Structure formats: C-alpha cells, structure tokens
C-alpha cells in the first residue's frame, strides 16, 4: 500500500458490559459478560490501516496510566507510529459501553480524557509529520479546533483529507 497515512485522534479503553437490559436509575444489575479492549475512533482507524499494511502515524494525547500502556502496546503490535504527548496530570480516555443482549442496542458513555486536551498548538507541533502524508484523517472525538488545525495544515500541503464526523 503506497503512501503514508497520518491520523489525528484519541485512544480510549473500551469497557463493554452485556446484560439482558439496561439498569434503571438507582438499580444494580448483574451482567452477563464484560470485556476490555482498545478503542477510540482515531486509534481504531490507525490500527486497522496498519494491519492492512499502510504506513500509519497517529497523533494523540494520553495520560500516564495503565490505559496509556494498553494504547502503546496496541499500537506497537499493529505497527502504528505514535506521535503522542503524555500528560502526568490527566487520565487516558475510557468508554463505558452497555449492550442489551436481546436487541444488541448499545449505550455509550465516553470520557475522552487526555484526548480532550489536544490543542491546535499540539497539532501544529506535528505539522512536518502531517505535511509528509499522502492522506490525513481525523474525527471529532478530540476538540474541533484541533481537528480543524490538522485539516488546514494538510490541505495547505496538498495532502488528501478525510473527516469522519463521528461520534455525531
């Protein structure tokens, strides 16, 4: 796969619970299963593209915690180059996902953690990385101003851009 993909996005640790139904306010419900896995739209896109053989760089922010270690392990295993700022004063993102067994409907609570602190200045610090890309991708899990900054840098350099408006 020729070219290089640069992705601006966040990592979250997905914590997924399956239950027959959603609990009511104030109720504790016994679930059927639990799984923890790497998540975050940008991180997932980077991992998927790298597994398909692409040269991928991910620009993101993490806390300094166990979820950050999961992120780095995931990216290393997939072959993703990480351009990441670690914040000692913030947590890595996490998502609570509840899946109802019968309907397979889900409800998600997302805490973007350190990913919510990505600024245009953080993105501008990676301008040289973005300008070397064939494709620049981003989503809207990190702040809109950061995504806009990345898109502007990429377009000015003639890099093809992709905006996934998720999680909208």
Report the location of each language-model feature:
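Ribokinase/PfkB-type carbohydrate-kinase core domain
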Residues: 1-11, 57, 72-87, 99-168
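Glycine-rich phosphate/adenosyl-contacting loop at the front of the ribokinase-like
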Residues: 1-61, 68-70, 76
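Residues at secondary-structure transition points
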Residues: 29-44, 66, 87-91, 113, ...
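Thr-Gly-centered strand-to-loop micro-motif
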Residues: 31-32, 39, 61, 94, ...
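Short beta-strand scaffold segments in enzyme catalytic cores
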Residues: 47, 94-98, 107
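Short, basic and Ser/Thr-rich N-terminal targeting/leader segments
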Residues: 52, 78, 90-93
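Short beta->alpha junction loops/turns
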Residues: 61-64, 143
